[in-house]
Every structure is written in structure tokens, then in C-alpha cells.
Design a protein with these regions (language model features):
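Generic detector of well-ordered alpha-helical segments enriched in charged/polar residues
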Residues: 42, 160-164, 183, 187
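Conserved catalytic core of nucleotide-sugar-dependent glycosyltransferases
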Residues: 30-34, 61-177
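Charged phosphate-binding loop/patch that engages nucleotide di/tri-phosphates or the phosphate backbone
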Residues: 175-198
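Intrinsic disorder/low-complexity signal
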Residues: 16-18, 128, 187, 197
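Active-site-proximal specificity loops/subdomain of glycosyltransferases
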Residues: 1-56, 65
């Protein structure tokens, strides 16, 4: 599959726009592009059966499928709790569990971005808002030891380039880091941003 179209919702940025409007539009446009690419996955699922299990991951999220019998899972949504690795394969952030890979049966899949947006907590039965929400669910199965999330396995220069071009690049445009500052962060074994915010 090749995704070579401009996604719906991308808007032009004009010279007359305020700084706030420009920042907002950069972020919204990046989100529309990322969501459009992710939703295009559905084109490759056209021939999948209704009971097929669909897993949606970013490219740096690897689900651990050992010891999982999907036939024994009755919940609607499956969330994989993944170990987080930063900068190097052996630099584990033990205090952060990443819920990256998410899964459901094809019959329940609204679209890939919907699955990605599902909140990573199980809501109690008395939360009536879950009956009307498209991202809050009660029927969730957590897979502990659910895999690995390897992020920013790059040099400081490569991370600098990534930060200028990915979804949240506007934050970086407004508060940039130099390659030397990123190198210092790597050497201190710190995350670039507060990963608990998202």
C-alpha cells in the first residue's frame, strides 16, 4: 500500500496568520497527516475476516505475542503494556510502562486511529459515559509483559532532525534543543520530554 494523498483537514498557513494560529495549524496539520497514514492501514484489511485480530502499533512498538491465546480473550479491546527503551536497546526506563500496541477484532475496529486513541485504562461499570464514548471502555484486557517500545534509537543529530519533523515538531520549533543539548540529555539518560504527559 502506498499512501500518497493529502489527508482531509490539512489547511494552508497564511502570512497573515498570528503566531498562535500558525502553531495551532502546524500541530493540526501534522495530526491529520499522521492519522491519515494510520487509517490507510484499513485498506490492507479489506479481506480480513470479522473475527481476525487486528493489532495497531507504531513502527517502534513490538508486541510480545508469546503465551497469548486470543481465543480465550473475551474483552473487546486488548492493550499491550510494553517496556520502554530510550536511545539504546539496553537503556530501559523501568518506571514507565508504555501502552502502545492496541488490538481488537476486525468487527469491532472503527478505524486504526480510533483504536490508537482508546484510553489505556479500564473504566468501572458505573461510568455511564463509557456507553457513549468512542475512546473509553470497560471491556479491556491488559497484556502484561506485552512487548517493547524502542524510541529514539538514534544519534543526537538524528534525534534533532526527527524533532523538527514529527507530529509535535511545533513544540520543538518554539523551544528548540541543540544537538549538544540532546547529547547531554542522552548521556544523562533522561527523556527529552515528560513522557507521562501524553
Amino acid at each position: 500500500l502506498i499512501y500518497d494523498q493529502q489527508p482531509i483537514g490539512v489547511k494552508s498557513i497564511n502570512n497573515k496568520d498570528t503566531d498562535h494560529e500558525i502553531s495551532s495549524q502546524y500541530i493540526f496539520n501534522a495530526g491529520h497527516r499522521e492519522n491519515g497514514q494510520r487509517n490507510y492501514i484499513a485498506e490492507g484489511l479489506a479481506n480480513a475476516d470479522a473475527d481476525d485480530i487486528i493489532l495497531i502499533s507504531d513502527v517502534d512498538e513490538i508486541p510480545n505475542l508469546d503465551n497469548i491465546n486470543f481465543q480465550n480473550i473475551n474483552e473487546k479491546i486488548i492493550l499491550f503494556k510494553q517496556n520502554m527503551f530510550y536511545y539504546k536497546f539496553n537503556l530501559h526506563l523501568p518506571k514507565l510502562i508504555w501502552t502502545g500496541t492496541k488490538s481488537c477484532k476486525k468487527r469491532d475496529l472503527l478505524n486504526p486511529q480510533w483504536l490508537r486513541n482508546v484510553k489505556d485504562r479500564k473504566y468501572p461499570f458505573f461510568r455511564l459515559d463509557t456507553f457513549f464514548s468512542k475512546n473509553k471502555y470497560q471491556s479491556i484486557k491488559y497484556i502484561n509483559d506485552g512487548g517493547w517500545h524502542f524510541t529514539n534509537l538514534k544519534t543526537a543529530k538524528e534525534i534533532h532532525f526527527k524533532l523538527k519533523s514529527y507530529l509535535h515538531h511545533r513544540e520543538f520549533d518554539v523551544n528548540p534543543l541543540t544537538v549538544d543539548q540532546i547529547n547531554e540529555i542522552i548521556n544523562d539518560k533522561r527523556a527529552i520530554y515528560n513522557l507521562n504527559v501524553d
